[in-house]
Amino acid sequence: MEIKDLQDYVAIVNDWPKKGIVFKDITPLMNDGEAYRFATDKIVEYAKELKIDIIVGPEARGFIIGCPVAYALGIGFAPVRKPGKLPRETIEMEYDLEYGTNKLSMHSDAIKPGQRVLITDDLLATGGTIEATIKLVEELGGIVAGCAFLIELKELEGHKKLNGYDRLILMKL
């Protein structure tokens, strides 16, 4: 398998979750053991190069990408969630959506100062989620060593919010 083959495992769903949206569904990739392992292994290789201490992923698909990477590396995983979903003390970060704002939260003890962090997610779109996640990690004293995505939606230019941050993008659609 090659990276270019991964696109065969992304289903395009028109008008979901609402009219006018073209959704990139990664469940076919997850359903295929060879493709899922291949994508995970590429991110593991990237994380090894960066000497990562911990993986951070926003809910929910960031968990799907990040947890197997953390497991393969024998390191921890720290979830980033919507407010009110984590049971202990958290920090929060607001970010902009196309129409309004949203918030993400993280346990306030999830990252130790100086830890090298890899942020994982399935998709880089506008960059709002990744930007807020970076701010959460840095507020806790973590070093964002890199960001890894299965897919970047090129036309939404989310990569502009990652200036100065190393990144791995397996597919640009």
Swiss-Prot record:
GO BP annotations listed: adenine salvage; AMP salvage; purine ribonucleoside salvage
Top-level lineage group: Bacteria
Function according to Swiss-Prot or TrEMBL: Catalyzes a salvage reaction resulting in the formation of AMP, that is energically less costly than de novo synthesis.
UniProt pathway: Purine metabolism; AMP biosynthesis via salvage pathway; AMP from adenine: step 1/1
A GO molecular-function annotation: adenine binding
EC number: 2.4.2.7
Keyword terms of this UniProt record: Cytoplasm, Glycosyltransferase, Purine salvage, Transferase
Organism in which the protein naturally occurs: Listeria monocytogenes serovar 1/2a (strain ATCC BAA-679 / EGD-e)
EC category name: transferase
GO annotation, cellular component aspect: cytoplasm
UniProt family annotation: Belongs to the purine/pyrimidine phosphoribosyltransferase family.
Chief place of localization: cytoplasm
CDD domains xrefs: PRTases_typeI (cd06223)
UniProt subunit comment: Homodimer.
Name of the protein: Adenine phosphoribosyltransferase
InterPro entries tied to this protein: Ade_phspho_trans (IPR005764), PRibTrfase_dom (IPR000836), PRTase-like (IPR029057), UPRTase/APRTase (IPR050054)
Subcellular location: Cytoplasm
Catalyzed reaction equations: AMP + diphosphate = 5-phospho-alpha-D-ribose 1-diphosphate + adenine
